[in-house]
């Protein structure tokens, strides 16, 4: 079945030839099958390793089966977070991003051919998935080595995947992600590298490392931006929440911003001190803390966590922006949860999930419960700053399924402190109010 299905797809000729040469080709049917692939079978511990020329066997990641999911760790601290300089463009179309040929002594067509040669020697996962939501999204495809099941499972949770039995015989992807982890060592000196190769009909992403942030997450966002640029619409880097006040008033807020700009915090329940007060701020000069009493809180109904589709088909003509989530799951960073009781909402979701989750950069022992405040150590006494969990949005209570009309738009900017002695652009302060027609001005600083 898998062979006929895969070879019946509308694929580039070079990829089709690689798939014909490859060993086993697995097209996953269920999420449970995906988690089994992540473990490499029925064992509780699995090493994701590859034979690399002149280096021998290299363990890129370890996967442990816990009671509440699988826990992925990377032996190399460098691989535990996205390298901000890992994205390159392989084509000659217009871009403001660095081109591959300007950074590395390699030709894109040669590299592309070598990737297909390598994939043709592997057992493979071939997984259809959606780029964007299931109504307005675009067909995508992941081609990855079979032992990288956790990567495929993470992408499936983030974007949603099509089970083998539901894939049409003439499935033609608009975007393809190729995963080739060994190339990090053989071609790029150990660096994280993700290369985008764009054309009008196909957007290819070559992912040369197993941390999913630059490819399964940001890579898919890049695909959406490229398609939107061609078609005249945008995917905003934004969280969106519908707020229902104690008086049954409803307000929908969309908050844009770069990493650290407060997007995920928008859809989190507010953190309280043991006495119920809320710590609003700490004066970095004096150490004084500002606390707030808030006896009644609003209900938060999340709409988007990080990627908001602003597709023309969603717009209602009311002059208010209408958005929908571009993701099926959220790549949540939980570095702020350092002890039990910090965030009961997420702790409950992660300790007792409806189905097993995929955790990264957290301590995990076979058969135990992965606790999200036990972060992997980068060095003795130095916890990894990037512990993650991939949370399918269908597991989140109160989540809004479908589109939402935005009432208020805000923009978050992470800034350094601004003092009289050391002035900085932190002077922009906590809140600026400006007309929607000037939103583009703030968006210039977004990635």
Q: Residue spans of the language-model regions?
A:
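N-terminal pre-Walker A segment at the start of P-loop NTPase domains
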Residues: 213-246
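Long, basic/Gly/Ser/Thr-rich N-terminal segments
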Residues: 1-214
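Generic recognition of stable, solvent-exposed alpha-helical segments in well-folded globular domains
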Residues: 110, 211, 215-219, 261-265, ...
